[in-house]
């Protein structure tokens, strides 16, 4: 009898653990491609923060959240609107045409943008929060040139849309996350990480309740250092929580099998990627982060960063890795621990 009772108690956790793969497999190439064809189209005018195209992209993301059943946060709005002083342009490589970027991005003293909130309330641990981010803004247009930003960061944005849909399907089927999950495409990244900075200054949950941030920025191309797309650069996972790094490794080894490349995973990396995307605003608030990144390529910050060059199988694989990692963080009994400091 005791043995049978143990098995009955153990069975729900086993089934809950098996569900992660079921929902991960709903993240598919055709859906990622469908979203990116729209978000990286000329009609979005390059999605520059504060401009018409960015507002159109925000509406597209909001409508996706609405259509899959995510309600407005606190029944009020899907948007966290901000008006902040223009920052400095962000560039993930050292050979960008900075004079050109300043002309494009430095015209307005104040910037109005929106972060889009896809909030999925948890169950017994709902007061703790996992945040998944990607920036949906890009460089906009200049004269007759449109910077579509298919990889930067259309690729990460469509990943968040599919992660949101997978979590919502789980919730509808009675397998929703124990911790709350916030899928938050942000704007203002190209102008100085403005949207994520605004969020960490005005969080919807206390920052001390935020367990981790998983940030996705450029996952749709292959850089010059790799022969194929079976890799992803991970940055930051062990800097604040070795436990987060270990979980990430375990999930990948068990379910995905990518090469996890830590080439740029150092605070003193000369490329300074740790400081160049939205995860940094969480990390500097002592929130563990992972930054998922494919590296820069010849079309980075150019009008040639277009949809037809995207490797959607690569996006699918990395998106499933992010989802499975978030699933584990949201459903484990104990929240991950910060590294001990002397």
Question: Each PLM stretch: what is its role?
Answer:
Residues 116, 132-191, 322:
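Alpha-helical metal-binding/catalytic segments enriched in His/Glu/Asp
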Residues 19-26, 42-52, 102-107, 143-153, ...:
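Second-shell loop/turn segments in exported
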Residues 47-119:
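A non-catalytic alpha/beta surface segment that caps or lines the substrate-entry region
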């Amino acid at each position: 009898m005791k043995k049978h009772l143990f098995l009955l108690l153990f069975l729900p956790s086993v089934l809950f653990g098996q569900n992660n793969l079921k929902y991960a497999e709903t993240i598919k190439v055709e859906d990622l491609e469908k979203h990116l064809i729209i978000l990286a189209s000329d009609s979005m005018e390059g999605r520059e923060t504060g401009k018409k195209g960015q507002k159109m992209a925000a509406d597209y993301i909001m409508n996706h959240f609405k259509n899959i059943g995510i309600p407005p946060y606190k029944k009020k709005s899907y948007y966290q609107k901000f008006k902040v002083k223009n920052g400095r342009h962000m560039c993930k490589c050292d050979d960008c045409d900075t004079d050109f970027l300043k002309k494009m991005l430095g015209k307005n003293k104040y910037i109005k943008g929106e972060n889009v909130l896809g909030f999925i309330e948890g169950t017994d641990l709902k007061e703790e929060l996992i945040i998944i981010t990607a920036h949906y803004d890009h460089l906009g247009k200049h004269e007759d040139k449109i910077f579509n930003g298919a990889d930067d960061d259309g690729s990460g944005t469509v990943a968040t849309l599919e992660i949101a849909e997978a979590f919502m399907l789980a919730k509808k089927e009675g397998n929703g996350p124990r911790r709350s999950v916030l899928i938050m495409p942000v704007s203002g990244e190209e102008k100085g990480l403005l949207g994520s900075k605004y969020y960490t200054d005005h969080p919807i949950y206390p920052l001390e309740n935020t367990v981790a941030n998983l940030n996705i920025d450029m996952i749709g191309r292959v850089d010059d250092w790799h022969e194929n797309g079976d890799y992803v650069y991970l940055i930051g996972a062990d800097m604040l929580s070795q436990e987060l790094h270990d979980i990430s490794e375990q999930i990948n080894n068990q379910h995905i099998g990518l090469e996890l490349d830590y080439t740029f995973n150092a605070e003193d990396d000369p490329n300074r990627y740790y400081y160049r995307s939205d995860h940094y605003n969480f990390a500097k608030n002592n929130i563990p982060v992972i930054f998922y990144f494919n590296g820069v390529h010849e079309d980075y910050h150019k009008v040639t960063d277009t949809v037809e060059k995207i490797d959607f199988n690569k996006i699918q694989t990395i998106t499933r890795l992010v989802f499975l990692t978030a699933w584990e963080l949201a459903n484990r009994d104990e929240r991950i621990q910060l590294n001990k400091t002397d």
